Amino acid sequence: MRWHALAIASALVVATQAHAADKKYGPGASDTEIKLGQTSPFSGPASAYSVIAKTQAAYFKMINEQGGVNGRKINLITLDDAYSPPKTVEQTRKLVEQEEVAVILNPLGTPTGLAVRKYLNDKKVPQLFVGAGATLWGDHERFPWSIGFQPSYQAETAVYAKYVLKNKPDAKIALFYQNDDAGKDYGNGFKKGLGPENTAKMVVAESTYESTDPTIDSQIVKLKASGANVLFMHAIPKQAAQAIRKIGEIGWKPDMFFLAATSTSVSSVLQPAGFDHSKGIISSYSFKDPNDPQWKDDKDVQAWHDFMKKYFPDGNRQDQLIVYGYVVAEATVQVFKQCGDDLTHENIMKQAANLDVTLPLMLPGIKLKTSPTDYFPIEAMRLQKFNGEIWELFGETIGND
């Protein structure tokens, strides 16, 4: 009997050791926790975007209360970088070298993200779902540890350009965007969508602004004076609201007014600008808008409202940035589910580059899909127009494979 008991005990020890050996952990991961790092502008000119980080913290709290991911709780550490690249460098180094996080999740901004891209790739730390759509975030060959999330800015503006060519072939176009890599990507994308011949013929004015500019009034007045009857604008929420209001106040009524999808928040952009000035603006979207009556009986939208009520009661439900933050958090949970018990940096990045899933708040027909050679998780969208109260979708899904 004694030898029999010893044999069973030995077998159990071997089985336990084998099971433990199946688990692989890199920095920031253990049997009980997955530690994520993030930089977000809680202060500075882009502070409206900080609601994304707040949403994700609330979402992970919900997931943790439900038992976590594969039994592990998600610990999100978010540091303020004020939308300042030097500050992003400082805070990211702190997250990697002191906190030893598993990933840098959804850091906000192209100029800020670029400031740490080489550092994170040299360290082989996943820069996961960067909160920007500059085309350079798809550079999987040179920067395999950095992956974007939303449709690329060039893909987005190509949709607007094609809409103009189809519906107003004699347009006089003005382009207004932020003077950084993101803004230039938007401007170049619009021109690329028009084609060289149409760009030379149709683009009559182009102007930029700095994220630190206290006002953009002079640029708007200059663009109106060009005689343009179609306007495309990329701006962070503060300047977007200023510009829309100024356009309305000086009586400029472009026949078409396209607004970059990064600044479509009703609460932080359109409401401050004035709904009367915002009516008729066109943009694009890939998610369900919980304020759109067509989704009032949708179970996934109802689940979002339940989440908001319990975990983020102070959040403004008219802020589309909250929906974005929620979807990114869902995608992050999907990555960690796929990781199983292998939570090394290598496997986290491998799973992020092998996604094929439809998340609950995505519009019908739009998927989250990546591959080792495709670092743009979302590549489809629909056009939407602001009716003075909410955004209304129109047209077909564009960019779906």
Predicted regions and their residues:
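Short, low-complexity disordered leader/linker segments with a strong preference
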Residues: 1-35, 398-401
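Immediate post-signal peptide segment of exported/extracytoplasmic ligand-binding proteins
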Residues: 20-37, 65-73, 165-172, 342
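Beta-alpha junction/loop-to-helix N-cap segments that form part of ligand/metal-binding clefts
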Residues: 21-24, 33, 48-54, 66-139, ...
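Extracytoplasmic "Venus flytrap"
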Residues: 24-33, 37-57, 79-86, 108-109, ...
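Extracellular/periplasmic Venus flytrap/periplasmic-binding protein
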Residues: 86-90, 135-138, 143-250, 294-295, ...
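Periplasmic-binding protein-like
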Residues: 95-108, 128-130, 173-177, 227-237, ...
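Extracellular/periplasmic periplasmic-binding protein-like sensory domains
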Residues: 247-324, 397-399
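Segments of small-molecule ligand-sensing domains
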Residues: 310, 314-323, 333-391
